[in-house]
C-alpha cells in the first residue's frame, strides 16, 4: 500500500501575548514560509483543501483570533495530525509570567484578556487558558531571557530547512539557584564535580577558560561521566532524527552556572560538532551578567 504524500508542511505558532509570537511569525516569513496571522480557527481546514502552494505555511494563533479557545485549538491539532497530507508542528512561544508583566508595564499596553484590569490579571488568565495547548507543543521556546535577535536565531536552527538538514542540538548551562530553564529536553546535574569556585585563582573565571576546564577534568569522576554522557547523546541523536524531531535541547546545571555546567556544556558541544551535528551553545548566567552591563536599549527582550 502506497502511503499518501504529505503535501503541506504546517507550523501553528501560538503562546501568551507578549512572549514573541509576532517576532516568530516574521522570522518564519523571512525563511520562506507563507505566513497568515490571526486566521480564525474554523478557516484553517479550508486552507489545506486546495492544491499545495509549494512552500511551508506558518499560522499565527492566539487569544485575539476570532473563535479562539483552547479546546477548539486542540481539536484542530488532532484533526490535522490525523490528516495524512499534513506534516504538522506546533510551536509554543513561551515566557515567564513575571517577564510578561514587566514587558506589559514597560510598553504600557493593555492585555487583550484584561483591557480594564491590570496586566498581571490578564497574564495569569491567559497562561491558565493556554495550559492545555502548551503540553501539546512539539517545540517550546522560552523567551524570558531572549532578545528578538536571540529568538530569530533559535527559530532559524529549528525551522530553516535550508540552513541544516540534520537535527540541530542546543546545549545550555544554568544555575540551579535561578531555576531550571523551561523547554529543555534533557537535564544533567554537574554539581557532583569538583568546584573551581573554591580555588582563588579560578573563582572569577568561567568554564570557557582552559584552566577551569582542566581543573574540572582532573576530577576522577569526570572522565567516566563525560564518556558516558557523550555516548548517550550520540546514541540518541539519530533516533530522535528518525522520529522526525528537528531539535534537541540539553541543559547542564551547577550551583552558580559559571564553572562546572559551562565547562561540560562547552566540551559536549564541541564533541557533538566534531561528530558532525549542528550545535549551538548558550550560557544563561553568563549572558545575564553580560546583559547587566549593557545599556538599557540593548537589553530589549523578545
From Swiss-Prot:
GTP binds at residues 62-65. ATP binds at residues 15-22. Keywords: ATP-binding, GTP-binding, Nucleotide-binding. It holds the Pfam family PapZ_C. InterPro entries: P-loop_NTPase, RapZ-like, RapZ-like_N, RapZ_C. SUPFAM superfamilies: P-loop containing nucleoside triphosphate hydrolases. GO terms for molecular function: ATP binding; GTP binding. NCBIfam families: PRK05416.1 (NF003828). Displays ATPase and GTPase activities. Belongs to the RapZ-like family. This is Nucleotide-binding protein Rsph17029_0317.
Amino acid at each position: 500500500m502506497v502511503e499518501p504524500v504529505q503535501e503541506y508542511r504546517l507550523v501553528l505558532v501560538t503562546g501568551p501575548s507578549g512572549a514573541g509570537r509576532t517576532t516568530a511569525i516574521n522570522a518564519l516569513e523571512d525563511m520562506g514560509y507563507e505566513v497568515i496571522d490571526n486566521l480564525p480557527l474554523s478557516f484553517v481546514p479550508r486552507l489545506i483543501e486546495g492544491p499545495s502552494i509549494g512552500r511551508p505555511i506558518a499560522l499565527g494563533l492566539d487569544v485575539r483570533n476570532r473563535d479562539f479557545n483552547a479546546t477548539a485549538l486542540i481539536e484542530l491539532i488532532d484533526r490535522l495530525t490525523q490528516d495524512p497530507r499534513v506534516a504538522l508542528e506546533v510551536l509554543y512561544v513561551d515566557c515567564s509570567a513575571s517577564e510578561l508583566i514587566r514587558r506589559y508595564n514597560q510598553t504600557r499596553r493593555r492585555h487583550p484578556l484584561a483591557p480594564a484590569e491590570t496586566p498581571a490579571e490578564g497574564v495569569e488568565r491567559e497562561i491558565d487558558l493556554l495550559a492545555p495547548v502548551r503540553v501539546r507543543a512539539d517545540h517550546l521556546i522560552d523567551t524570558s531571557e531572549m532578545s528578538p535577535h536571540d529568538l530569530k536565531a533559535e527559530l532559524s536552527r529549528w525551522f530553516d530547512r535550508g540552513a541544516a538538514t540534520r537535527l540541530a542540538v542546543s546545549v545550555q548551562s544554568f544555575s540551579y539557584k535561578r531555576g531550571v530553564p523551561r523547554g529543555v529536553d534533557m537535564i544533567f546535574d554537574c554539581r557532583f564535580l569538583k568546584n573551581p569556585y573554591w580555588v582563588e585563582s579560578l573563582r572569577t573565571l568561567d568554564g570557557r577558560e582552559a584552566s577551569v576546564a582542566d581543573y574540572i577534568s582532573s576530577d576522577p569522576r569526570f572522565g567516566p561521566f563525560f564518556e558516558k554522557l557523550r555516548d548517550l547523546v550520540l546514541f540518541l541523536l539519530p533516533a530522535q532524527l528518525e522520529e522526525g524531531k528537528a531539535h534537541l535541547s540539553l541543559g547542564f546545571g551547577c550551583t552558580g552556572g559559571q564553572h562546572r555546567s559551562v565547562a561540560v556544556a562547552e566540551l559536549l558541544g564541541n564533541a557533538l560538532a566534531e561528530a558532525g551535528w549542528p550545535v549551538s551553545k548558550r550560557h544563561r548566567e553568563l549572558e545575564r551578567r553580560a546583559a547587566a552591563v549593557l545599556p538599557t536599549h540593548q537589553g530589549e527582550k523578545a
